[in-house]
Amino acid sequence: MQRPSGRAPEQLRDVTITRQFTRHAEGSVLVCFGDTKVICTASVEAGVPRFLKGQGQGWITAEYGMLPRSTGSRMGREAARGKQGGRTVEIQRLIGRSLRAAVDLTALGEHSIVIDCDVIQADGGTRTASITGALVALVDAIRYLQREKMITTDPLVHMVAAVSVGIYEGVPVLDLDYPEDSNAETDMNMVMTEEGGLIEIQGTAEKKPFTDEQFAGMFSLAKKGVAELVALQKAALAQ
C-alpha cells in the first residue's frame, strides 16, 4: 500500500502550531496539518449563558467556519444564505465538547471563553486540526485570565488533541489528507486526552464494515498521533 502523500501508515503530516497569530484575541493560533490550515482564536467574555448564571462556573463554546475558497471550488458563505449547514453545527459542537472536557469549568468562575475556528485552507482533517489548535489558544486565554487576576487557580485539567485515522487500501493509516479521506474504506476521528482518555470517537465505514482488529489498529495509531500532537502543543506553549 502506497499513501498518496508517500507517508508511512503511522506518520502524521507536518504539523505546526504558531501562537499569537492575531493581535486582538486573548489566545490565537495558526495550526497547520500539512496543507490544512486553520486560524483558532479564544476570546474571553464576561458572564456566562443564562442557564449557568448564579452557578459559579464558566463556559466554553465554539464556532467553526470555512472561507469560501478554502477548498478547490468556491463555496458560498453560510452567512449569505442566512443559515448554518448541518456539518458546521456538528463540528462546532464537537470542538466545544472537546475543549470543555479539558478544563474544570468551576475554576473559570463566571467567565466565558468563545473559540472561533476558521479554516483558511482545507486538505482533510479540519475538525481535528481545529481541536488541536484551539486547545493551545484556550490555554493562552486561561493564562490571560490568570495574569489579570480574574481567576486564582488553573482550570486546565487535561491536554486534549484530535486526529483522524482510517482504513486506506485495507491498511490502518493515521491523519488522512483529502485524497485519502475521499477514498478511504473507513474514516474516523478520535479526540483524546494526554493520558489516553477518550473524549469522542466519530467513525464511519464508507465501503465495507471494519473489523475488531482493524479498529484496534486505528485506535493504536490514534493514541500515537495524539501523544505526538500533545508534545507539539506543549512545545508551542513553552515558547
From Swiss-Prot:
Example of a GO MF term: tRNA nucleotidyltransferase activity
Keywords: Nucleotidyltransferase, RNA-binding, rRNA processing, Transferase, tRNA processing, tRNA-binding
Catalytic activity entry: tRNA(n+1) + phosphate = tRNA(n) + a ribonucleoside 5'-diphosphate
Superkingdom of origin: Bacteria
Classification via Gene3D superfamilies: GHMP Kinase, N-terminal domain
GO biological process, one term: tRNA processing
E.C. number: 2.7.7.56
PROSITE patterns in the record: RIBONUCLEASE_PH
Enzyme class at the top of the EC tree: transferase
Binding site for phosphate: R87, G125, T126, R127
Record-stated family: Belongs to the RNase PH family.
Biological role stated in the UniProt entry: Phosphorolytic 3'-5' exoribonuclease that plays an important role in tRNA 3'-end maturation. Removes nucleotide residues following the 3'-CCA terminus of tRNAs; can also add nucleotides to the ends of RNA molecules by using nucleoside diphosphates as substrates, but this may not be physiologically important. Probably plays a role in initiation of 16S rRNA degradation (leading to ribosome degradation) during starvation.
Binding partners and assembly: Homohexameric ring arranged as a trimer of dimers.
Entry protein name: Ribonuclease PH
Organism: Saccharophagus degradans (strain 2-40 / ATCC 43961 / DSM 17024)
Gene designation: rph
